[in-house]
Amino acid sequence: MRCTRAIRQTARTGWLTWLAILAVTAPVTSPAWADDPPATVYRYDSRPPEDVFQNGFTAWGNNDNVLEHLTGRSCQVGSSNSAFVSTSSSRRYTEVYLEHRMQEAVEAERAGRGTGHFIGYIYEVRADNNFYGAASSYFEYVDTYGDNAGRILAGALATYQSEYLAHRRIPPENIRRVTRVYHNGITGETTTTEYPNARYVSQQTRANPNPYTSRRSVASIVGTLVRMAPVTGACMARQAESPEAMAAWSERAGEAMVLVYYESIAYSF
């Protein structure tokens, strides 16, 4: 597995070499796509449309620090007080993440720890002015507070990140439809069904072209985990997984990813 070997080799030769390469090659300004915010974003969730179409999505709490959200500190495995709901402008990434969760169910059944059945949902959401680009918001944070360690990887993050942060809530009226994916652990068959949301309100809107300006973190942010591919942050991804596990997931999905790991705060809890 190329990604896994690369990670292990990086650990042996020193991650500072990788950081030096990124510091030289990362763009010094935000990329052109940052000026063209998406009209549609996607979210993986385990909750059924009977709940989501009625209630929408609500953030954990009121912590609007972008860096703490992206590193997972304010998410479920941390303090569970993030003021953001994670979405992705990449449907493919969301599908890859769902496939990963489905594979987990299959492997658990093989190990005698489950039935192998799996149900997951991909929600298609109309973005509006309440959605902010994670990359541009990260740039804004670094520029405002002068986090030099973060600045080294800011260009790489801005280039490859596809997360959009909904502040506080995504109302049902913004949720266009859902794709339900069911894997039968007995037959091995996977079926996909799409359901429209009767409460959806069609409008011509896009995500906010401006970054979200957040307060400064009171925590000691010593590092982050950057995945060099379209990804979402730790609040949707599984930051508790090791880099090796995430590399294996990437290769199973057929997407070559380069993982750069430097003292991730996600592993400090």
Swiss-Prot record:
Q: Name one GO molecular function term.
A: NAD+ poly-ADP-ribosyltransferase activity
Establish whether keyword Transport is in the entry.
Answer: no
Q: Which family does the UniProt entry place this protein in?
A: Belongs to the bacterial exotoxin subunit A family.
Q: Does the keyword Kinase apply?
A: no
Q: What is the recorded name of this protein?
A: Pertussis toxin subunit 1 homolog
Q: Which InterPro entries match?
A: Borpert_toxA
Which gene is annotated as encoding this protein in its UniProt record? ptxA
The record's annotation in SUPFAM superfamilies points to: ADP-ribosylation (SSF56399)
Q: Which keywords appear in this protein's UniProt record, sorted alphabetically? A: Signal
The secretion signal range is: 1-34
Its GO CC terms are: extracellular region
Q: Which Gene3D superfamilies match?
A: Heat-Labile Enterotoxin, subunit A
